[in-house]
Regions:
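N-terminal membrane topogenesis motif
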Residues: 1-37, 88-91, 95, 126, ...
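Interhelical loop/hinge segments that connect adjacent transmembrane helices in multipass membrane
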Residues: 2-20, 185, 200-242, 281, ...
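Hydrophobic transmembrane helix module of multi-pass membrane transport proteins
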Residues: 2-8, 100-237, 243
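Transmembrane alpha-helical segments of multi-pass transport proteins
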Residues: 3, 378, 432-482, 504-513
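Signature of the first transmembrane helix
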Residues: 3-4, 16-76, 109, 113-116, ...
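Small-residue-rich midsections of specific transmembrane alpha-helices
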Residues: 31, 37-41, 58-84, 137-144, ...
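Membrane-interface helix-loop junctions in multi-pass transport and translocation proteins
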Residues: 46-55, 154-157, 168-200, 369, ...
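Specific pore-lining/lateral-gate transmembrane helices of multi-pass inner-membrane transport
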Residues: 82-100, 260-376
Length: 513
């Protein structure tokens, strides 16, 4: 058994501001680029392939994303922590993790074979896609272990570089295949290629510094799985919550309905760039106040909650207004049912933006256990909601995807209410409810101002008109405190400064000595 004496462990290196800035900038650039590429694919892929093929691809991804969490078994979090504490054991830890993942992937294949045999209709294309995406999952879970290790070594810039490269490969190859007339099977192979590129790229940067030891240490593997299982529950709960709707729609409605739902959710997902980007810029600065004591929680929580309220309401209600014409424009008549699903997801978006902030606050306030209970409850609630709403909307509206969206709305609203209730007392105050009411009124005014455009050929004018009306009403109502407006201005300045090329051009020139 391999072990290290604690006295040989080198002292941790001092915190480097330059390293933190480099990692944050790399993550920001990678997020922006991958978001842009995902957006391009989300537009062209459904229109060219059609709802049936998109549904088949979505089902395959949903199955393996759930199984992938079981294969990972929470080891990513364990690896990051273990490597950060004992970098000299990187080779042993990585080698053990990779071998364990391969073994768990083989077990996962047996489980998927059973599901494919009994739960999925005898469709050769669907079966082929399931196993192609299964191969992609193998490379993805192996790459995930390497990424976790690089994160532990504080080499996030390598992770960002490889992420952008693999997404670029996926985007270019997928679009080339789509425009050349290849079917969904080839799109599945494009995902395999991108996952392989990611694995090889991560391996290149990691293995040149730390060679893995492929001889598995059973004691180390047992310890790794035992410690990692505490992270598995949260990850599995979240993944089941995110993916189970598609499998229920396939079971109670049709594969085409899965395509309608998956297309709407993918487009909705591209809008999640904003809370992640804002969290990257603002939240770390605000959470530093937690170190001063629990009483400073409200000082950090209230401004960012107000800001996310002010941002989520116009985007969410704007999506409600123009979802149907946007879906028709982007995807064509075959995806008309996607429009109403996307409109419902506009309401979900408001809740999800706020839930993103609340989950960060709960973790910062040492309420992780409460957050886990909320997510488990939401996942459990999703099952009967899907079982009731999907067949009902399929029967009444001929759109089972709508039932999945309604279930999603109910659970996200439930998470929002529960998360607010379990925050430490006084975290949110009367000022937050005032901001919520006034920004809600501004959003309602915006919705009334642009609703008539949804049936117009010029529906796209709803975006600038809605923005002007909303901003004008927010300022007129004095909905946001002056301090929050200052934070928004500073955040936008930091965001622009971190963007490649743009920030460099806007940086003022240094005066010559």
């Amino acid at each position: 058994m391999t072990s290290e004496v604690s006295t040989n462990t080198p002292p941790p290196s001092p915190i480097s501001g330059a390293r933190i800035a480099r990692n944050a900038g790399a993550m920001m650039a990678a997020q922006l680029l991958t978001w842009a590429m995902a957006f391009v694919v989300a537009i062209f892929q459904p229109r060219i392939l059609g709802p049936l093929a998109i549904g088949q691809l979505s089902i395959a991804f949903s199955i393996w994303m759930i199984v992938g969490v079981l294969i990972t078994f929470g080891m990513d979090t364990y690896l990051t922590k273990a490597v950060a504490r004992e970098p000299q054991r990187t080779g042993v830890l990585v080698g053990t993790s990779l071998v364990v993942r391969i073994g768990l992937w083989l077990l996962g294949c047996l489980a998927v074979f059973g599901y494919d045999l009994f739960a999925v209709n005898a469709d050769p294309t669907q079966t082929a896609l399931i196993w192609i995406i299964g191969l992609m999952t193998l490379f993805s879970v192996l790459s995930g272990g390497l990424i976790a290790t690089l994160n532990g070594l504080e080499q996030v810039h390598y992770v960002s570089l490889v992420t952008v490269l693999s997404k670029m490969v996926l985007t270019v190859v997928s679009l080339a295949l789509l425009f050349a007339g290849f079917n969904v099977i080839w799109i599945g192979w494009a995902n395999v290629l991108a996952a392989l590129v990611a694995f090889l790229g991560d391996a290149f940067f990691l293995f040149r510094q730390h060679r893995p030891r492929w001889s598995i240490d059973l004691a180390a593997a047992g310890l790794m799985l035992n410690v990692s299982k505490q992270y598995l529950v949260t990850a599995l709960t979240l993944m089941v919550y995110q993916q189970i709707d598609r499998l229920f729609i396939a079971l109670f409605a049709s594969t085409e309905a899965v395509g309608w739902y998956g297309t709407a959710v993918n487009l909705f997902g591209t809008l999640m760039f904003f809370p992640m980007a804002i969290g990257t810029v603002i939240f770390p600065t605000l959470t530093r106040r937690f170190a001063a004591g629990q009483e400073h929680l409200a000082m950090a929580a209230q401004p960012i909650f107000n800001i996310m309220l002010a941002l989520s309401i116009p985007i969410g209600l704007g999506l409600v207004a123009i979802a149907e014409p946007v879906a028709l424009l982007l995807y064509g008549e075959a995806f008309r049912p996607t429009g109403v699903v996307l409109a419902v997801l506009g309401i979900v978006l408001i809740c999800t933006y706020l839930n993103t902030v609340l989950s960060q606050l709960l973790i910062a306030a040492d309420r992780t256990a409460a957050l886990n209970i909320i997510m488990i409850a939401a996942t459990v609630a999703t099952l009967p909601l899907d079982a009731i709403l999907i067949p009902w909307t399929n029967r009444v509206f001929a759109n089972g995807a709508l039932g999945g969206a309604l279930a999603y709305t109910i659970t996200e609203l439930g998470i929002l209410i529960a998360a607010i209730k379990v925050l430490p007392k006084g975290t949110l105050g009367a000022q937050n409810w005032r901001v919520g009411v006034l920004t809600g009124l501004a959003g309602a005014g915006m919705l009334l101002a642009i609703w008539w455009l949804r049936e117009s050929t010029f529906f796209f004018l709803a975006v600038p008109l809605g923005a002007a009306v909303y901003i004008g009403l927010v300022l007129a109502f004095r909905a946001l405190p002056d301090d929050d407006l200052t934070i928004i201005k500073e955040a936008l300045s930091k965001l622009i400064a971190r963007l490649p090329f743009i920030g460099r051009k806007l940086k003022p020139a240094q005066p010559e000595a």
